[in-house]
Design a protein with these regions (language model features):
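Domain-core detector
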Residues: 1-170, 179-181
Length: 181
């Protein structure tokens, strides 16, 4: 299912691209630790292609290549760390959703600031398979656009992040984005 990005037009895409390229040029752009060395090398171009002409769906399809991912992942169950083979399709969809939404929110927030808009509303762009209570509590909130812009990735990047920061998307697989009020 595709996300509903209310203002995903050429103007927003252009700002998304500018913001993405600025982070890339900063020397320490975010890269998922789940990506392989090759995945980290090609991710930037895949993201640029999605920003210019695609969506989270086209990005997920581009990422759905086992050579772009570390083959194993660690997870914790009942307090015990374990390893399992990575589900490439699931990992591709999760990263694509989170990254495309992150850049959409960043680009739209910049656009709204440039237009003098002070507040925005958090909304769910699509219905997730499961809803995190922590994420769901933000549905419908009216938020200061500058807070959204300033807290870009603040919960997790740069590491260790600020777990108390308010960021949209709130975390991996979050289906929340913003719109003008």
């Amino acid at each position: 299912m595709s996300m509903n990005y209310a203002e995903l037009d050429e103007k927003t895409r252009g700002i998304m691209l500018s913001e993405f390229e600025f982070e890339e040029a900063g020397g320490t752009p975010y890269r998922s630790k789940a990506l392989s060395s090759r995945g980290r090398q090609v991710f930037s171009q895949l993201m640029i292609d999605a920003i210019k002409h695609g969506t989270e769906v086209t990005l997920a399809n581009a990422l759905n290549d086992a050579t772009l991912w570390e083959p194993m992942e660690t997870y914790v169950r009942d307090g015990v760390s374990r390893e399992r083979k990575r589900n490439i399709r699931q990992a591709s969809e999760r990263l694509a959703l989170t990254e495309f939404s992150t850049w959409y929110v960043r680009g739209l927030a910049r656009r709204l600031l440039d237009e003098g808009v002070k507040t925005c509303q958090v909304y769910r762009g699509a219905q997730p398979k499961w809803e995190s209570g922590e994420c769901s509590e933000h549905e419908g909130r009216i938020i200061d656009v500058k807070t959204i812009y300033d807290n870009h990735r603040a919960r997790y990047w740069p590491e260790p992040g600020n777990k108390d920061a308010f960021s949209i998307p709130f975390g991996p697989s979050c289906h929340h984005v913003i719109k003008r009020v």
